[in-house]
Amino acid sequence: MEPAPLKSFATWARTELITQVSARIAAVLAPASPERTENPRAIRALETDIATAGGDAKGKDAVADKVAYTWFNRIIALRFMDANGYTNAGVVSPPADQIVGQPEVLADAKRGTFDPDVVNPKIAKDVTGLLDGTRSSTDPQGEAYTLLLAEYSRYWNKSMPFMFKREGDYTELLIPSNLLADESILARAVTTMTSAVCEDVEVIGWLYQFYISDRKDEVFAGFKKNKKAGAAEIPAATQLFTPHWIVRYLVENSVGRLWMLNHPESRLVDRMDYYIAPADEETDFLKLAGPEELTVIDPACGSGHMLTYAFDLLYAIYEEEGYSPSEIPTLILTHNLHGTEIDHRAGALAAFALTMKARARQRSFFTRSSNELEQNKPSICVIEPIVFRSDELDFLIPAGRDREVEAKFWNQFEHADTFGSLIRPDAAQTAQLAEHLKALNDVDDLLRSDTVARAMRVIHQAQLLARQYAVAVANPPYMGSKQMNSLLSQFMKDEYSETKQDLYGAFVMRGIGLADRRGLLAIVIGDTWMSIKSFEALRTRLLDCHSFDSFLHMRDVSNHPDIFGANAAFVLSMASGRQRRAPFIRLTPLGQESKEQDLRAALVTRTPDDGFHLASSVDFEAIPGSPIVYWLSEKLRAAFSTGKPLSEVATLRQGLATADNNRFLRQWWEVSRDRSAFGCTSRKEAKASGARWFPYNKGGEFRKWYGNHEHVVNWENDGAEIVAFKPRSVIRNPGTYFSPSVSWSDISSGEAAFRRYPSGFIYANTGHSGFGEEELLDRLALLLNSTYAIQALRVLAPTMHFDIGYVGLVPVAPGVRDFPEERLADLMRTAGADWDSSETSWGFERSPLVEIAARH
């Protein structure tokens, strides 16, 4: 599927629909509009919604946006059904044998043909009058088609209310104009959503992501201005359609894996191209009595991509077990698949996508009774904000009960449009209050009917989120704490303190809670949690209490076309298996297609050369901070077990922070040599020298062994001026000033570079330094610039910062003192000569060019 035409259509459609719907709002709200006379109830509902959304221009813009996406969803849904023959006649499409032309239902109407199951006789008469000229109109065909489109929307509301919901009865008043024009949204929907494109319901998800892409750009532009994300921004900022091969990996290695563990003889494996067979034998897994028990939830389901592929896999499972094909779709929707979402638009599309999956497998799916359709509709729940007033709580909470506890339960969804499925209802309390509500529901009190209805909604949402499932699968929202508004930030601190740095971490914990204690979590998230210190608690939890079944590491460039970053997709068993090995697969940074090819190759060869590694929880726990460094060699892993941390071998320290470098620092050539002192060995000697300026090691560019001797600092009279500049200045570890050291820069875009400094330097907070005996420092300089240390620091220092906490964890073997000093002397001599060949070195004598010229 080529996404570019879909994106072009969807982004254009949003702008076009908002413009047209806004024009219709202005027209129907005009003082003398015919709609005010013919549809006063709908006009009142429209005016109420505009006022609720902020009134005036703000309210009208909000309603226009809502109605625009409502019609976009309906038009693409109808086009999808037209293309697949699920409608008796093309509702938005020309006849199947035509690419262009008027919608088939309009062409039929011109011939006097109407579907009696859809079109009300009165509407048929009005349409006929418009088309034969007996009813006056400035746009008879356009008005006739508008009436037909409204009728078909009402008809499909019976079987798909989530997609064809009656929004206060005014959406029909706001049907976009010019739908029959050559370049209308209908015409472009038909040419973009070809029959080939509509073979897979995945197209619906891509269209929605592209439809909101402009809004997403607005939100991210706001982040750059330090704006925060709340309920209105989270869907646009976090909605990403997952590439199909990642969906397949996650679902096949969770839903498929659990079935294969229960039925090792199953031929389901033949259709799972991304299935990774267990490396070690497994005995501790969820036992299933039948397919109905293979329940799946996606707690951030978006437009339903995970669930639609799970539908395909489950259909194959039911079929293999001998179930009748005609009953399988209903069984899957009733027993197996569940999704929650905070975005109404995405939730509607997810339910639609699952309905299309069912209809594709069961021709009679839409011909069932209304009760059957209601009972077997997709279990997609848009988690809605619900709050009760004090008098309503008086009604819901009987006297003698703990009001504070029960009030908290009833109002737990107050901010559900922000927190969504991260809300964790208590299962026992949910069951208890569900029984209590049944009694209240029998109370014949019209004044309380709304309260009871909302309470029932609370129970429904709580029941979905309080139960456990065989599999939880998700591509959850990614959002760092810096983008969260105060409400969400505080919620994360209170409820998910171990993972408050990013929403995706909270969803890992939530997925664990939603999975059965022997079930599986399949999830794709960012990869920063694998190594940085702030996620150490999450790593410890996963390694101590659970076990990885398989892991894909997608480095450098995200698989999502809109995001730069990196991703980790993994399947986690809720059962702990610390010694059990799992496959960890490292994929190329060269884009989606290359990553997919890498995965296929790794699954065939299962060798490290193709990125396939085996590791267990114990392997990671041997390394400080337990980073997920599955690619580590056995020798390097052993070094962490046997060696001493560098911080126990040498004294590692941070240095001086002047707080005003412009005032206290100079380049050495900017000051008088007479006021400078080089080579002091102590603070006492420096003070006695009477000098003002002393060599200052502030890190600097990448340079090994020797160099970056450029700056001097005002340390006259033992730093009196800097001391007086407190509390802004920070004078750390002054007892080590002027001592010989091994030093390195705090920041490097690649590997760290370590330099040997002689006596005479004060060092900065960005020129981290290690101290000890001269001989030890020589050996450490050799060790830290070695390939061994480079590899160790790739594990220990996952960011561009090489602070002393990370470097101090480098394991030092007992034989470090056996390193050859002569080698260091050669390296220092070469690096020193290179540094001193520049006129910016205080050791400069003459240019090497002079020597070259002299030889010639």
Regions found by a protein language model. Name each.
Residues 1-313, 339-349, 353, 375-438, ...:
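Preference for the N-terminal adenyl/adenosyl cofactor-binding alpha/beta module
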Residues 2-7, 308, 315, 319, ...:
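Signature of N6-adenine DNA methyltransferases within the class I
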Residues 72, 76, 207-211, 503, ...:
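Short alpha-helical scaffolding segments that buttress acidic/His motifs in well-ordered protein cores
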Residues 212, 697, 735-753, 780-794:
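Short Ser/Thr-interspersed hydrophobic loop/turn segments at strand-loop and sheet-helix junctions
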Residues 229, 268-273, 370-374, 379, ...:
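A glycine-rich phosphate-binding loop feature that marks nucleotide/adenosyl-phosphate handling sites
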Residues 241, 301, 627, 633, ...:
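Non-catalytic DNA-recognition/assembly elements of restriction-modification systems
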Residues 323-348:
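Cysteine-dependent PTP/DSP-like catalytic domain, specifically the C-terminal lobe
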Residues 338, 378-390, 556-565, 842-855:
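Short, conserved secondary-structure transition motifs
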